[in-house]
Amino acid sequence: MARITVEDCLKQIPNRFELALAATYRARQLAQGHTPKIESRDKPTVVALREIASGHVGVEMLKKVPV
């Protein structure tokens, strides 16, 4: 199993706070049944981080958050 580190994700989203918000929002989407953008059997939080590290999901996640 490949490990996901914060450093891998920081290459895509340099701000740690924005990274945490984007990962949280995407993990919630996945937990609610949205289709993952990568193939994985991991939990939603890990899938969200993998999507960010691979570049499939980025800061644009934060623009979709309802206020």
UniProtKB/Swiss-Prot annotation:
**Electron transport as UniProt keyword:** no
Which GO molecular function annotations are given, in alphabetical order?
Answer: DNA binding; DNA-directed RNA polymerase activity
Q: Tell me its EC number(s), please.
A: 2.7.7.6
Q: Which Gene3D superfamilies match?
A: 3.90.940.10
Question: According to its record, what are the GO cellular component terms?
Answer: DNA-directed RNA polymerase complex
Q: Give the catalytic activity.
A: RNA(n) + a ribonucleoside 5'-triphosphate = RNA(n+1) + diphosphate
- The top EC class is transferase
- Please provide an example of a Pfam family that matches this protein in its UniProt record: RNA_pol_Rpb6
Keywords, alphabetical:
DNA-directed RNA polymerase, Nucleotidyltransferase, Transcription, Transferase
Example GO biological process: DNA-templated transcription
SUPFAM superfamilies hit by this protein: RPB6/omega subunit-like
| PANTHER family (alphabetical) | DNA-DIRECTED RNA POLYMERASE SUBUNIT OMEGA (PTHR34476:SF1)
Q: Which family does it belong to?
A: Belongs to the RNA polymerase subunit omega family.
Name the job this protein performs: Promotes RNA polymerase assembly. Latches the N- and C-terminal regions of the beta' subunit thereby facilitating its interaction with the beta and alpha subunits.
**What interactions and quaternary structure are annotated?**
The RNAP catalytic core consists of 2 alpha, 1 beta, 1 beta' and 1 omega subunit. When a sigma factor is associated with the core the holoenzyme is formed, which can initiate transcription.
Spell out the protein name for this chain. DNA-directed RNA polymerase subunit omega
What organism, scientifically named, is this protein from?
A: Burkholderia ambifaria (strain MC40-6)
